[in-house]
């Protein structure tokens, strides 16, 4: 007989969750949970549950769907959808070959059960903290030899589990924050990607989002220049007194460094260890599914990536996006906002308004980012 586990398949629905409430404690488990018993006895469960809706089999064997399920996945359409016409359908081949994001099943327990004992140890942090909409598409990547080698290196640096806080741990950000970007910005809600290089290497600065620092930490010079450019584009913006960009992340801005850890006081100390290969795969996943749940949910290409905005500042970021389809995505390039280069093309680049103009044209007003809200 098949085990109970083999009869289960799990679909994580965090991508279609509305923006988390501002007061949420961790913002890491903001998924809607749906448990559904189907006619074949299989189960669909979102285990990051904050709300659960159950479907039970009827005596005729048909599935009785509760209204809550309908409310989650359908929306009454008007006579015509302007956002659908803006987005345009995917080519027929793309629609048939690419499953919709929320239809891809993933069971964390079954995945963990499939790991060797060493893999279970090395990948504990990924299984516990990598956002599930990302993990289900990166699960094979993190089992590759290069990534396991990276994890062995990090273990030697003291990064092993979620709550590592030994006095001699001098790696930033804290392990629990390495994958913050994946929890604050679910894959299907990505609107914009901003690419950094490696985390800030001073105490208390890095928290898993590029260019961002926790409240109470001095605003870095590059971020001050970013604020100055937003002020130039949106004159009503009053530059924040803090440098925490969490609100952007929650509003669909993926703040991704290409190296996700760094040794204290040693810039680029964890580069060329494997992170760049991993984050290149993250960009590939974004290329395929970023923004999959934006815009009209009833269109034939819903659930698949239809294009997003990449803000590419500096030569390093330009290399990361070099192979992306410029017809599918809006790729805006300029100098880096560092004080060393900001006046050579970053200031005055108009990127923030250009991004919103493109997003609104493609997805409607809900596709825009409020850059002035921090």
Show where each model-derived region lies:
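Glycine/proline-rich loop-helix segments at beta-alpha junctions forming the active-site rim
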Residues: 2-112, 251-374
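A polyanion-binding, active-site-adjacent surface
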Residues: 110-121, 125-309, 316-319, 327-333, ...
